[in-house]
């Protein structure tokens, strides 16, 4: 199944939903209609029983350049309009992602700048082409990160490295130390891997095959524990150990009654590949 607007393509195949940002002439910079479609597509994928994994990528040579700087020049009528524009606009994407228990993978095919980098780090995993480059970007145009970088980056790379990324906004060719959120330096893919911003870096020509091979591995797995694992990992960041272990014991009791658990045990005993059904 494929549905699309001019600015975002949505396709479902083999239990994998692909969201493709589609403004290649503008490096896939956001627009209002694109964000509307993005929020819709995430909700659609979450509630579609034929979707087990979501992949987000960009068309052309960029992943996403973030907000359209040319449009920023027009400004907002009031500060309140600007705040509400974020909350009711682009913030729908991280708020929707927070509620999704299906795995979401960013397939980073090129430059990811500003909110484009932010949108990549709020996905569960990131697989990047070896030519991909990253920058928080905001400080270069006198802004604070607007889509959640200050929330997600510290959880990925730690406070000091997050500040370095967000302070500098320059390209980084080699490891640096303390200023990331203040400088908006660009980071090459190998450094992004070293910092923990991405989990895998592959040659440009292999990016699509590598991403979908990983996505299919997850999509073919037992979906009940896969989604419970995602919930447990994210909830663990907000809970004390005893509360977390209480949740773990409850989830374990549930999955041990599932057909997929029984199939997994049977397949192990019979030395064959399991055939999970998601129940």
Regions found by a protein language model. Give the residues of each.
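Thr-biased low-complexity repeat/linker tracts and other Thr-enriched repetitive architectures
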Residues: 168-183, 187
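CoA-thioester-processing core
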Residues: 90-100, 106-107, 113-167, 194-195, ...
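C-terminal long alpha-helix characteristic of the crotonase
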Residues: 24, 127-132, 188-189, 198-246, ...
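Conserved CoA-thioester-binding segment of acyl-CoA-metabolizing enzymes
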Residues: 1-59, 95, 175
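Glycine- (often His-adjacent) and acidic-residue-rich active-site loop
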Residues: 7, 58-96, 112, 140-142, ...
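Terminal low-complexity tails and localization/encapsulation signals of metabolic enzymes
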Residues: 1-6, 266-279
């Amino acid at each position: 199944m494929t549905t699309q607007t001019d600015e975002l393509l949505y396709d479902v195949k083999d239990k994998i939903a692909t969201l493709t940002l589609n403004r290649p002439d503008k490096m896939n910079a956001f627009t209002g209609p694109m964000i509307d479609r993005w929020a819709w597509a995430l909700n659609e994928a979450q509630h579609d029983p034929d979707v087990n994994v979501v992949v987000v990528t960009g068309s052309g040579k960029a992943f996403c350049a973030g907000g359209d700087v040319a449009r920023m020049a027009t400004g907002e009528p009031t500060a309140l309009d600007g705040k509400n524009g974020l909350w009711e606009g682009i913030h729908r994407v991280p708020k929707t992602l927070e509620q999704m228990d299906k795995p979401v993978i960013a397939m980073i095919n090129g430059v990811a700048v500003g909110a484009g980098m932010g949108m990549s780090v709020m996905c569960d995993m990131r697989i990047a082409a070896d030519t991909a480059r990253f920058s928080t970007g905001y400080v270069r145009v006198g802004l604070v990160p607007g889509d959640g970088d200050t929330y997600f980056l510290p959880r990925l790379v730690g406070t000091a490295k997050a500040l370095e990324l967000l302070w500098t906004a320059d390209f980084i060719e080699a490891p640096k130390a303390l200023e990331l959120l203040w400088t908006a330096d660009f980071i090459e893919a190998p450094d992004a891997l070293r910092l923990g911003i991405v989990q895998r870096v592959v040659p440009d020509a292999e990016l699509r095959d590598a991403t979908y091979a990983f996505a299919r591995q997850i999509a073919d797995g037992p979906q009940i524990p896969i989604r419970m694992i995602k919930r447990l990992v994210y909830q663990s960041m907000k809970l004390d150990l005893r509360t977390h272990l209480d949740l773990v014991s409850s989830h374990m009791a549930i999955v041990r009654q599932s057909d997929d658990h029984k199939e997994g045990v049977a397949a192990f005993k019979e030395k064959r590949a399991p055939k999970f059904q998601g129940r």
